């Protein structure tokens, strides 16, 4: 009897294994085309999951590119992926084929924090009516509240003043500037979303930022990729909360803020910020179940604005200060330009930027060298597309490798070095390269780019107007190698700030 049970068990195992192999074979059969991009041989069921180093993704993609070319394929379990490298191929995908490559692949790991059919936010929303509705709303609302205008510029300048005051308290001894940079940039976003700025010592504010900081990497590592590729695993009770504890806690805190803010909303009064404007649209959308204006989507939109608007800018500023202490000659030249154009008394203004080509070049080179979003947010083809002679089927996930563009050896003189002259012509005038795309390109380019540019210029010039930065005495020279997550952050470092 035991023998029969054993034989039956093994028969079941063998049958299941053969069935899964057959499913895997049939799933991949449609990609067996002569013009499908080449790539490493996938393992049955797993694909290339074990061949990609998710902790060092840019380098892993670089190695594959060296072997398979600018357009190559990967298989993440049963999910087909094509990686696009180099300026020519990336522009072809994002711009020339933009209408057919603007979709997003499903991201099952976000379902446990509120992502759903009518609550897709903006960044990860499927390309269609809901995305268009929310992007249009965010762009117009940001414009209404001063993006590109003097009113928001004053907010940023005032916050830069608070940041400089906080730096003054740290002057004279080594400190890591990252936390203070996070607080200042987050306050700009909070003012835009909630019409409220936090005191730097506010316990809730510090807890919120700590959770967000600790969530970096939770949605970009090997575990996240496996769960996205095999979403049935997310049905295991308690697994999502254990796999993404900090992201879950951050989203819960955002929801708490929204509930508290909603109790103070008066629809009869002009909107105080983006949240009030969204709530007004929710009222208008009642009776339209297909609308993306609902309470669930408000949380997703606010999360997108918070994460994209705060994390990217503060991380870039952290790179900027690191590179200033590593390149004191560049820092001195920026300060000389600040002294010549602005002086030491008045605060910097956006109008100054046109007369400060070197400072502008340095900020752009910080963005290029820092390369904080090397693999971009994945896209997905909504139709068959042809790229560089390869045929990519509908439903394929695309990874535009922005790092391969920002460090393209055919474009940049010194792609792996910090070199502000990349953005200056022979006469010292600022020039912008086609290969400069830290905000991506095409239909899904970052909608917060105008705000980010304003923040980077005003915060950076305010800091270098007030302080000189250096490597602390007795400490080794910090590394300029980043730590891969979303975003890529500098290796932790300390600096000394001396009031000028």
Swiss-Prot record:
PANTHER family: CYTOCHROME P450 2D26 (PTHR24300:SF109), CYTOCHROME P450 508A4-RELATED (PTHR24300). Has bufuralol 1'-hydroxylase and debrisoquine 4-hydroxylase activities. The keyword Heme applies. Expressed in liver, but not in kidney, small intestine, and brain. GO terms for biological process: arachidonate metabolic process; xenobiotic metabolic process. Keywords: Endoplasmic reticulum, Heme, Iron, Membrane, Metal-binding, Microsome, Monooxygenase, Oxidoreductase. It is an enzyme of class 1 (oxidoreductase). The keyword Metal-binding applies. It comes from the Eukaryota. Its EC number is 1.14.14.-. One of its GO terms (molecular function) is iron ion binding. This is Cytochrome P450 2D27. It is found in: Endoplasmic reticulum membrane; Microsome membrane. GO terms for cellular component: endoplasmic reticulum membrane.
